[in-house]
């Protein structure tokens, strides 16, 4: 699982489990999640975004399921636009390193090292201003929605505050 930032570079990469492992599981096991659980106390520290496959938390914003008013629909539209930048970052990485597109045919421990190396080299290329490879950036990943019971009450309060204040 990779966590891209606004300029299509990656702030974090976790390459410990097979490719079929859901990103939300990988996130739950990540140091970033544990850091946010301990240290995220206010909205001014920012939030991260996820799709409906993630549980809503006070630091992790997810879309509303069947939004029933204009503000919630606009929130969802904006969240989707932000998520598309995540998919664009992953698309750029996979075009730059085509070995990542079709699956690596090496031992799992070597695959993890290759993935991390590709992410590091991608970030270096972005910092040096290397051209991006052309291609389709609109990658949509399917996810199974998380059970709403896993959403935190604090997360709902923060999401509602964001929707009501900014949309």
Whereabouts are the PLM-identified features?
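Short, well-ordered secondary-structure "scaffold" segments embedded in the functional core
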Residues: 1-167
């Amino acid at each position: 699982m990779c966590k891209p930032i606004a300029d299509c570079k990656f702030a974090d990469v976790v390459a410990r489990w097979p490719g079929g492992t859901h990103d939300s599981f990988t996130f739950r096991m990540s140091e970033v999640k544990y850091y946010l659980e301990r240290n995220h106390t206010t909205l001014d520290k920012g939030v991260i975004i996820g799709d409906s496959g993630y549980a809503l938390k006070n630091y992790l914003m997810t879309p509303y399921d069947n939004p029933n008013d204009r503000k919630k629909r606009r929130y969802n539209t904006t969240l989707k636009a932000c998520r598309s930048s995540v998919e664009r970052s992953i698309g750029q990485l996979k075009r730059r390193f085509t070995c990542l597109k079709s699956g690596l045919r090496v031992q799992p421990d070597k695959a993890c090292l290759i993935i991390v190396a590709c992410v590091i080299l991608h970030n270096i290329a972005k910092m040096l201003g290397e051209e991006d490879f052309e291609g389709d950036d609109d990658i949509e990943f399917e996810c199974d929605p998380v059970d709403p019971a896993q959403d935190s009450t604090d997360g709902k309060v923060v999401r509602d505050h964001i929707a009501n204040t900014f949309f």
